[in-house]
Amino acid sequence: MLIDDVDRYIGLRRSLGFKLAKTARHLTAFARYAVDRGDTHVRRETATAWAAAVSSTPRSHQRRLQEIALFARFLYAEDREHEVPHHPRSPATRPAPYIYTPEELARMLDAAGNLRRQKPSPLRRHIYVMLIGLLASTGLRISEALNLRLDDLLPDGVLHIRQTKFNKSRLVPMHPSVVEALQAYLATRRRFAGMDDHVFLSVDAKPMSLRTAQSNFYVILRKADVGQNRSRRPRIHDLRHTFATRVLEQCAMRRDDVARDFVALATYLGHADIRHTYWYLEATPDLMADIAGAAEALIAGEVV
């Protein structure tokens, strides 16, 4: 039965590290729709009709057909009665990241340090100075930072990042200056945090939600006058992009060094696919200028 096939397919892909929460919901809904139509196999006509009925935009329509196509290919390997729906491919688009300058980061930290105190805890300004500083200096995902527990802070300035994207864990070493700032923050935190062991808490001493972090981050951006004249405002996730871009800007442009540095950075960031790291090459004019210069030298025969 198609619903059972969905469970098998999702179970297999999750065993490989994919979470697929939305995909599981979409495919389960599609399978129920197909069964209600009397289908025992994936049919192109049914897939197209379902995707058209539930999609509000061309992009979501394409995404649902892609999900069904991958599912159908999985089933087709076992039973050729299944049909793989056609889906138009459009070039993948990702919003250009906002790369914060050192001056902007300094203004943001200053703005965070001057946030208005909120009862019952005076921790608000300390929390956001540390959170922004940690994200900017380590490239952690915001979800990884908010999920940090006290026992994830290992000796020698290492963070243990547990079961994050693709269900992987990794160790993230920190710069000594970051370790020092984190220890000072924790000393202040102990006086007001209560019993919860999350590193970052909301003012009521409960684990901080992503929504709360983002809301306060936008307050900080406004106070620091960062990105206010843009149609699309900078995101907290852009701190991760900024970290990766600055690291790559400091890399030597020799081919062997670039390959080594990319692998190291991909591991540090927790990327399951190094292609996600290569994307950072497009992030700043400095990187593109370095790449162009290296390419010209290679063409001219100056690089072996």
Residues of each region from the PLM?
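Conserved catalytic core of the tyrosine transesterase superfamily
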Residues: 1-304
